[in-house]
Amino acid sequence: MGRFREDMETYKRNDPAARSSLEIVLTYPGYHATVLHRAAHWLHTKAKLKLLARMVSGFSRFLTGIEIHPGATIGRRFFIDHGMGIVIGETTIIGDDVKRFHAVTLGGTGKDTGKRHPTIENGVLLSAHSQVIGPVTVGEYAKIGAAAVVLDDIPAHTTAVGLPARVVRVHTPEEIERDTTIGGNL
């Protein structure tokens, strides 16, 4: 239960519209998708009940409009704001304190086996409609701009925008200190 409480506290801290824990538990699709994913991931990786895991994942997608493969690994304090249209592929690895907005895709390359989805390191911000495709890495506390398409690695502590995404800004030491002290990009 500790992880679910931590997830709920993450929503309270990151969404100024959240009025209570009860409101989050009852009405927040991003929270529902996260909690259901944690259950599906356990079924998929620990219990080895892959069909049941896919059924939980399918129910979550039906309920929330957010598609997270049960094989994806998601760290602590994961935050989804306005989650419709989110896709997270099977071999995706997401670190702690990652924030993402609506219609973000962490997609694969079409390879049949092996690592084919992105690695998103701690503290990354994924803006609306951004796409990260293939086995690339987005470094710690990077910010991916709205509608950016990431096809190559993005270094830590940078901002990337465009199609294809290019680094347009390297964060200052003061920004890095602020981001890492308060638990991620705001």
PLM region descriptions:
Residues 61-62, 66-168:
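Structural signal for interior beta-strand "rungs" in well-ordered beta-sheet cores
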